[in-house]
Regions:
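Positively charged, low-complexity terminal tracts
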Residues: 1-104
């Protein structure tokens, strides 16, 4: 399983939780399973700003949630600066490099 490390500041954390919460509400309203989104929200909330490790599924979930939030704000004529910055930081997330295949 591949994981990525995102550099996350306080603003990115806030907007990411807001985007995932919107995704959580839509999934819950439609009756679809939303436990994975809920666990990710709680994990991000418990993480201090700095580096956030995301698995491949979590990365895709966060990317899609931020993109949906950005699209909603564009449709309503709102500002997308915070969502754009968080999405850019998420897309720049790196796959960790382990020298000789060893994890630290």
């Amino acid at each position: 399983m591949s994981e990525r490390i995102m550099k996350m500041d306080r603003n990115d954390k806030s907007i990411l939780i807001r985007a995932l919460h919107a995704r959580y509400r839509t999934l819950k309203a439609s009756g679809q399973p939303c436990e994975e989104v809920g666990r990710l929200i709680l994990r991000i909330d418990a993480t201090d700003p700095g580096r956030l490790r995301l698995g491949e599924d979590e990365y895709l979930l966060a990317r899609n949630a931020l993109n949906d939030l950005r699209n909603q704000r564009i449709a309503s004529g709102g500002y997308t600066d915070a969502a754009d910055a968080a999405l850019a930081n998420l897309l720049r997330a790196k796959v960790p490099f382990h020298l000789f295949g060893h994890a630290r």
